[in-house]
Curated annotation (Swiss-Prot):
Protein name per the record: Myosin-1
Polar residues bias spans: 1015-1025, 1076-1088
Cytoplasm recorded as keyword: yes
Location of the SH3 domain: 1106-1165
GO molecular function, one term: actin filament binding
Source species of the chain: Schizosaccharomyces pombe (strain 972 / ATCC 24843) (Fission yeast)
Length: 1217
């Protein structure tokens, strides 16, 4: 079955089969599927490299212990019961599988449901999902999850549609209560088989459903194994019955009834009977079971419970009598019949003889206590069985559809699994027979599908041997030769009245089956070799269970009841003179199984094979032997081999091409599917470009087949790596984009905020200019364009600051203006002199703060405090002076007269707080120095004072300022059309490192790594480097001795410096440039001037002896640029310059280079003395060596000097171009 591509689920599912030519419908985009998470092991067992039962078991265990309970075999799902909630059934996970194919998602029961729903909707084919496995393996849970998924994805708007979906979901709790019970293997074991067929219209919307019931284990009503329980509904009803039922039906606790307490297990861990009873009642309400119908249902349950409490004792005539007559009296009330009729039906059996077609005599045969108990139990089982059938029919009635647009259906089969007990009887034979039929369908349909696909695709394959269990099915159901069911029917017909005789006759007829290799007969037992293992069945009582008929007197008792509901649920008794043999239980089972097989054969099947990991129901235990046995009898190995018979993987051309197109440059570009030819040729091109041998694949008519799973692994791995690379590129581009966007946004915000602040500052400044416009001469600095009114120049608004505490401000006091100022201090007999003060203005008060020494400590005190609301006016002169008079109408200490350099800002701020303040400008200023005493201050022009004023003898002397009509210049703006950096102009080069004595111009140094305590790798050293210091040359006595010109030559930089990290500029002395060194010319005859009589200068004094700063290399360091030195561990080098950045300039063999400071340590050995000259260094270092060694050292040093001089000249030549 091909993996389908979900292109458009909304389209009508009328698409034809895949085009054999594989012609593409235009360019399509390759989609990166990221929904599939990484898994452990292999999620498809067909991809196992080694196919054995042990390898299958190992892979399932590995996934089980990692919480991966689902695994594929192709399209077959293997489910291992986790016995815990893994959180894998949430609504988000459910939605993640909607519209996805198997390759796009991890194995899950939702994927099986999605595939079945899509196939049904797209191709109008009936689907069925067959869930098989042993009891406790999780079949019922899987069926519930499938119903949950399908009802969700098919949900549509409409009252009727929503009602149908709700009823379908409500059938689960209802049928679980009446059809499930606690067993030793499973706390919620299905004791019946159920086939739910969901019916959909052409739009894929559910319009109805039908439930078919199989094999209800009615024997559980009267008999349970120790530590098992009866059906859940009995415990729910007896624990949580409403009071009206307790009063009407006499309901008591479960411990008071034999049918519920004999097993000695009234409660189960993890099951709340009270809560489940409410769920059952809600389900009945949703389905539409009326309250009178509910009353009758619980009446039948009450009858069964009270029947179980009837006990018999032996009578005088050898018959039996009822021990407690009160129970039968209450049962007569519940059933609606006389008490005597109940006692007669339970203790007496009516037998009738027959002579051919004539009716014979009628006899009343008394029953002993054992026989009476059997009749009681038969009645109880019959009531419950008929009640269960009625509930199923009632649900079907609620789900019946009136929609004429019925299209297709999806069937979900949940039937209890293969059973092997210590004592196996007729019930286990029927259950195992049905499982054999399902196994037969699985094998035939799986093999048939594979065969048809290979034939259709013209692919040759080798058939795989497998066990065909048809022989086992024939052993049970065959008529000729007679099988087990036929032998039982013959035995019943021979000895109808006597069960023991019938069992004996059945045992004799089994001798005819002894030649069957799958059958063995033993004393009073027989063995059937099923596909799941050998099962030993007991013959005792098997024929009686096969008859499954109520006695005539019991049926007569039921139909004599005045309860119409009870009579309606029981079938009408057949006429006693009918010669036709009534069908036995085996006949009904065989008919139901064949009908089920016929229904399933008309559908496209999907399979879920459930596995139980342990018998303890523990979430942590994995019984390898137990699972291995299930793997074997489920035939998983054969299924894998059938799936891999020819090829482990097959896919349609278009899907394969679109999935793996990225692996070929001819079929895709940048992740886009660009192939213009047909899909088949695209697949061939992809396989060719990925170097897949032709022996590893074959091309069918519409699909590509890959032989080994390793080939698929290789393709998937290459595809993952491609998308990983693409994802990395996208992430890198996205991060770069986000960073640029963030930086741009930050720049815009910064500029906008600055512009916004500047606009506000400019507006306030212009307001002040307007306030004094045409009234007062202006100072030159007052109208500068860069002048801004910041206000709090003394940071008085800082909480707990000096001025804050001095003025006693609180959090609610906002400082608007603070400034240093001067006030006139009046002294007796002398002119007043300005004295410094601090001015603080808030929205409420104006403070004048004085600083003075108190007790030899410098302290601050509030000298004056004015309420802003009490200020009447402000006085100024009409000249450019800075004196201001603040007149306080309610002041007791006089006004303030002070000099404030930012007077315009101060007055503007004051005016904005109190609009009633008058600004008085004139040639004089009047203020009250003391209360009631007016002082007049005059002004006088003095051109000797240009930019300042002074006070003397009541007169302010000031020079002529700018005209009163002067306006403030506009704020400076950034250059239009240029960037911020361009507007600021070129950034000056920052010299980070000290200049050397005679620097040598080198190419711009690369960034260096920060020094580390331990050696780091090369990759680590390339990150976060600070700029390295420029290379500097050591003094060279040879060059220094040569005459130099006095002309300074500009040296061009040899390399281009990065804009983001400018290299430190170096200034090269003319003396260090070889091009500027004067070379002595050769002597020329007759043209050489005579030497001067002046004697030559004396030779220079010997250089001072300096001590070498030697260091020992701790680690190896490999230089990666020309200005870095390569050093080896334990090598001794000389450090000539240390930089705080962590890079030191080292000297070794006459060559210099930078090394990390953390890679070297101070050398503690003997330090030889040397001169500054490199030549003398070499000589003194080798003064104790042999002549040969001295010559070698001298030669090496000379070579090093020549190389260094050549390097210097080369560098200078590069800078001259």
């Amino acid at each position: 079955m091909a993996i389908l591509k979900r292109t458009n689920r909304a389209k009508a599912a009328t698409a034809a089969a895949p085009n054999s030519t594989g012609k593409s419908n235009g360019i399509k985009k390759a989609v990166y599927t990221s929904t599939r998470k990484k898994t452990v092991g292999v999620d498809d067992l067909t991809l196992l490299s080694k196919i054995t039962d042990e390898e299958i078991n190992k892979n399932l265990e590995l996934r089980f212990r990692n919480g991966e309970i689902y695994t594929y075999i192709g399209h077959v799902l293997i489910s291992v019961n986790p016995f815990r909630d893994l959180g894998i059934y949430t609504m988000d996970i459910l939605k993640s599988y909607q519209g996805k194919n198997r390759l796009e998602t991890s194995p899950h029961v939702y994927a099986i449901a999605e595939n079945a729903y899509y196939q049904m909707k797209s191709y109008h084919e009936n689907q069925c999902i067959i869930i098989s496995g042993e009891s406790g393996a999780g079949k019922t849970e899987a069926a519930k999850r499938i119903m949950q998924y399908i009802t969700h994805v098919s949900k549509s708007v409409g009252t009727e549609i929503e009602r149908v979906s709700e009823i379908i979901l409500a059938t689960n709790p209802l049928l679980e209560s009446f059809g499930c019970a606690k067993t030793l293997r499973n706390n919620n074991s299905s004791r019946h088989g159920k086939y739910l067929e969901m019916i959909f219209n052409s739009g894929g919307v559910p319009v109805g459903a039908k439930i078919t019931n199989y094999l209800l284990e009615k024997n559980r009503i009267v008999n349970q194994v120790r530590n098992e329980r009866n059906f859940h509904i009995f415990y729910q009803f007896t624990k949580s019955a409403p009071q009206k039922y307790r009063d009407t039906y006499g309901i008591q606790g479960p411990e008071n009834y034999v049918y519920t307490s004999a097993c000695q297990c009234l409660s189960v861990d993890g099951i709340s009977d009270e809560k489940d009873f409410q769920g059952t009642m809600n389900a009945m309400k949703v389905i539409g079971i009326t309250e009178p119908e509910q009353d009758e249902i619980f009446r039948m349950l009450s009858i069964i419970l009270w029947l179980g409490n009837i006990q018999f004792q032996e009578g005088q005539d050898g018959g039996s009598v009822i021990s407690d007559k009160s129970i039968t009296e209450f049962l007569g009330y519940l059933i609606g019949v006389p008490v005597a009729a109940i006692e007669r039906a339970l203790t007496i059996r009516i037998m009738q003889t027959q002579h051919g077609a004539r009716r014979g005599s009628v006899y009343e045969v008394p029953l002993n206590p054992t026989q009476a108990l059997a009749v009681r139990d038969a009645l109880s089982m019959a009531i419950y069985n008929c009640l269960f059938d009625w509930i199923v029919e009632r649900v079907n009635k609620a789900l019946v559809t009136s929609d004429n647009s019925v299209s297709n259906s999806i069937g979900i089969l949940d039937i209890y699994g293969f059973e092997i007990f210590e004592n196996n009887s007729f019930e286990q034979l029927c259950i195992n027979y049905v499982n054999e039929k399902l196994q037969q369908i699985f094998i035939e349909l799986t093999l048939k599908t594979e065969q048809e696909e290979y034939v259709r695709e013209q692919i040759a394959w080798t058939p795989i041997k497998y066990f065909n269990n048809k022989v086992v099915c024939d052993l049970i159901e065959s008529k000729r030769p007679p099988g087990l069911f036929a032998a039982m029917n013959d035995a019943i017909a021979t000895a109808h009245a006597d069960s023991a005789a019938a069992d004996s006759a059945f045992a004799q007829r089994l001798n005819f089956l002894s030649s069957n290799p799958h059958f063995e007969q033993r004393q009073n037992q027989f063995i059937v070799k099923h596909y799941a293992g050998d099962v030993t069945y007991s013959i005792t009582g098997m024929t009686d269970k096969n008859k499954d008929q109520l006695a005539t007197d019991i049926l007569n008792l039921i139909h004599s009841s005045n309860n119409e509901f009870m009579k309606s649920i029981f079938p009408v008794a057949e006429e006693s003179n009918s010669r036709r043999r009534p069908p036995t239980a085996g006949d009904r089972i065989k008919t139901s199984a064949n009908d089920l097989v016929e229904t399933l054969m008309k559908c496209q099947p999907s399979y879920i094979r459930t596995i139980k990991p342990n018998q303890t129901k523990s979430p942590n235990d994995y019984d390898q032997q137990m699972v291995l046995h299930q793997i074997k009898y489920l035939g998983l190995q054969e299924n894998i081999r059938i799936r891999r018979a020819g090829f482990a993987y097959r896919q349609a051309f278009d899907t394969f091409a679109q999935r793996f197109a990225v692996l070929s440059g001819k079929t895709s570009y940048a992740g886009e599917y660009t192939w213009q030819g047909d899909d088949k040729s695209a697949c061939e091109q992809i396989l060719k470009d990925t170097n897949i041998p032709s022996s590893e694949y074959q091309m069918g008519t519409s699909k590509v087949f890959i032989k080994n799973p390793e080939t698929l692994f290789a393709l998937e791995d290459m595809r993952d790596k491609f998308w990983d690379t693409m994802a990395t590129r996208i992430q890198r581009a996205w991060r770069s984009y986000v960073r640029r966007r963030s930086e741009a946004a930050a720049c815009i915000q910064k500029l906008w905020n600055r512009n916004k602040v500047n606009m506000e500052l400019e507006r306030v400044r212009n307001e002040g200019t307007k306030l004094l416009q045409g009234k007062k001469q202006r100072r030159r600095y007052s109208i500068l364009g860069s002048r801004k009114f910041y206000g709090d120049y003394l940071s008085a608004s800082k909480p707990n600051g000096t001025l804050w505490n001095t003025c006693g401000l609180s959090q609610n006091d906002h400082v608007i203006f603070s400034m240093r100022c001067e006030v006139l201090v009046h002294k007796l007999g002398r002119t007043s002199k300005p004295s410094p003060r601090q001015l603080v203005l808030t929205k409420k008060n104006l403070y004048l703060v004085i600083t003075k020494i108190v007790d030899q400590k410098l302290t601050q005190q509030v000298e004056k405090k004015f309420a802003v609301s009490s200020i009447d006016s402000v006085g100024l002169t009409n000249l450019q002076d800075d004196w201001v008079a603040i007149r306080n109408k309610s002041s007791q200490n006089g006004d303030m007269f002070l000099r404030c350099f930012f007077k315009t800002e101060f007055i503007t701020t004051l005016k904005r707080i109190n609009r009633n303040i008058q600004v008085i400008v004139g040639p004089t200023i009047q203020y009250c120095r003391k209360p009631g005493k007016v002082q007049t201050v005059k002004t006088a022009k003095d051109e000797t004072t240009k930019d300042y004023d002074y006070y003397k003898s009541g007169t302010i002397h000031v020079g002529t300022g700018l005209p009163p009509t002067s306006k403030s210049k506009p704020f400076p703006r950034l250059a239009t059309g240029g960037s911020t950096a361009a507007a600021r102009g070129p950034r000056p080069v920052v010299q980070n490192k000290p200049a050397a004595t005679k620097p040598v111009s080198m190419p711009a140094a690369k960034s260096k790594p920060a020094p580390m305590a331990n050696p780091v790798s090369t990759a680590q050293q390339t990150q976060n480097r600070p700029p390295a210091p420029a290379m500097q040359a050591r003094p060279n006595t040879t060059q220094a001795a040569a005459p130099v010109t006095s002309t300074t030559t500009t040296i061009k930089q040899a390399t281009t410096v990065s804009a983001s990290k400018p290299a430190p500029s170096t200034v090269t002395s003319a003396a260090s440039s070889p091009s500027n060194i004067s070379k002595p010319s050769a002597p020329v005859a007759n043209n050489v001037s005579k030497p001067s009589a002046v004697p030559p200068p004396p030779p220079p004094p010997p250089a001072e002896v300096e001590k070498k700063d030697l260091y020992l290399a701790l680690y190896d360091f490999a230089g990666r640029s020309p200005n870095e030195m390569t050093i080896k561990k334990d090598e001794i080098i000389e450090i000539v310059q240390k930089e705080p950045s962590g890079w030191w300039l080292a000297l070794k063999n006459g060559a210099e280079g930078w090394v990390p400071a953390t890679y070297v340590t101070e050398y503690k050995g003997s330090t030889p003395q040397t001169t500054a000259s490199s030549t003398n260094v070499a000589a003194q270092a080798n003064n104790n060596a042999s002549p040969a060694e001295v010559n070698n050292l001298a030669g090496s040093l000379a070579d090093a000097l020549r190389m260094r001089a050549s390097a210097v000249r080369g560098s200078d030549e590069e800078e001259d171009w």
